[in-house]
Amino acid sequence: EKGIVCDYFGIDINPGMIAAAKEKFPENKDKFFVFDILEEQMTETFDYVISVGPLNLKFETDQNMDFTMRLMKEMVRLTIVGAAISMTSSFTRRPNEETFYYNPAVVLSETAKFCTNIKIDHTYLPHDFTIFCYKRNLYNFIR
């Protein structure tokens, strides 16, 4: 749509999500896989690894933050340039019981334990934010 050319590879632990992706993008159906990156070892690397919205539902036990940080660490391991995860923000004005809300300051603090080149964007929706973790210093990367 915007003329951006990329080679896309999609994974999800939910077979229904993979089936929906294959149906929506039949020309790329061979690039969508059911896979759990926290349980299975992935050997491929990617320029960017992006996760959008999978961490918004509350777990039955209070493990959202632990799971999220394990996922982010693994995403960073698989990336060459950087990783990004979008999350629901604790700064929302309309919380509900089913959603887990992440405090951006806590996510930043936890991410800083394994990534020093971090950016948070909390400007695009009132209840979401994305944390970006880059492998290299952004100042040197842009130059």
Question: What is the role of each PLM region?
Answer:
Residues 47-65:
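A short SAM/SAH-binding and catalytic strip from SAM-dependent methyltransferases
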Residues 78-89:
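Conserved beta-strand signature within the Rossmann-like core of class I S-adenosyl-L-methionine
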